[in-house]
Amino acid sequence: MAGKFRHELKFYINTATYYVLRHRLSALLSLDENAREETGDYHIRSLYFDDREDSNLVTKIAGEDSREKLRVRIYNMEDSVIRLERKIKKDQYILKHSCGLTRKEFELLMEGECSFLLQKDKLPAGAVYFSMKNKGLRPVKVVDYVREAYVHPIAVSYTHLTLPTT
């Protein structure tokens, strides 16, 4: 499996803590490159795929340490960039593979047609094709949220602190 796992921890915070962190972080860190100038955040819409038994959802709710999710993502309600993603979680480590989709390819996926994925040479196209054909994955859930992400270079990688604002 090509790629590099990254460490990911998530914490729930209350509104007051959010504003304190936001104030402190904005003085020390840069906003993520995807942030809109006028608001400092960006909108994410994800369409998740699952099987008829909702296996991916069940493993998430159960808190299983190893699981995967397949999704299509757009940013700021625009379809100029459409990403097909496979996210694998093993304990607190995350591996994400992503490839671009055209609007036409996205529409084909919505119709259950995925053979075009075999022509793509980037991960996760093959894994998504396999999952749709052999596990019966189909689009099931849309999730919208707004992200305020700060970035700080550490060695070669980046640390992202995401503050969901909705």
What are these regions (language model features)?
Residues 1-153:
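N-terminal strand-loop-strand beta-hairpin
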